[in-house]
């Protein structure tokens, strides 16, 4: 992830201020359905003895994390045979969705698997969108969290005690997709801003206060 962050900083600081100023994009954005980009499948359901050790198994907690998912960040583990490991495999660019939630607002929350070297598996309370179309994985994460997309998903989520999202609901979500070049540019800008905010949040309170006082007397 650090490589992506440094790449984002470099691009944001390029001459002409293309990404900083966010000048109007000149190419048209194409309307697509999410089902054209992803092939959906429910996750692994094993016996209680299957969990606790084995290969990394992506759960709802990983999907809800603010950071992208990688092999190292996955919290759970499960023992899967070779056929199961292949069937429930999660690879770079795949999108993971929360299948069931306790409230309407969180229904269908998504995250993206961003490990280019090692795969993982995913559990039964998660829907995997296997990457079958062309898109930038960083861009798609931010696009799927936009109000326009979230409203489509939550509006069609159903349930009483638990709010469920179906594969059909996800496949029918309408998207506006720019060119791959613009997807990369937009995605890296948001990635840079996210990392910048995170870095500032980690600063000790006294450091932030000193910085404000210094600016006051300049």
Regions found by a protein language model. Give the residues of each.
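Feature detects amphipathic, helix-rich regulatory segments
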Residues: 1-218
